[in-house]
């Protein structure tokens, strides 16, 4: 039943996209449909940004060390 509803929504959006000539939405729509059928959940945004914050902190520390070791001209 869930798959039938998703396919119906997919077909409606497909017709609307073709009518509006918004074909660039179709790859993301197909990917979302596949994810919904497989039952994957979206990742939390917080978990995506935490590693980047660590990288920024590491870079900042490296830059501070670099500037501390540079001679003054």
From Swiss-Prot:
Which positions does the propeptide occupy?
44-73
GO cellular component terms attached to this protein's record? extracellular region; membrane; other organism cell membrane
Q: Give residues where Lysine amide occurs.
A: 38
Which terms are listed as keywords in the entry?
Answer: Amidation, Antibiotic, Antimicrobial, Cleavage on pair of basic residues, Membrane, Secreted, Signal, Target cell membrane, Target membrane, Transmembrane
Q: Where in the cell is it found?
A: Secreted; Target cell membrane
Signal peptide residues are 1-22
Expressed, tissue-wise, as follows:
Expressed by the venom gland.
Asked whether the UniProt record includes Transferase among its keywords, one would answer: no
Q: Which domain of life is it from?
A: Eukaryota
Is Chloroplast a UniProt keyword of this protein?
A: no
One Gene Ontology term of the biological-process aspect is: defense response to bacterium
| Role according to the record | Cationic host defense peptide that have antibacterial activity by breaking membranes. Is more effective on Gram-positive than on Gram-negative bacteria.
Task: Family membership, please give it.
Answer: Belongs to the non-disulfide-bridged peptide (NDBP) superfamily. Short antimicrobial peptide (group 4) family.
Task: State the name under which the record lists this protein.
Answer: Antimicrobial peptide 143
Query: What organism does the UniProt record list as the source?
Result: Lychas mucronatus (Chinese swimming scorpion)
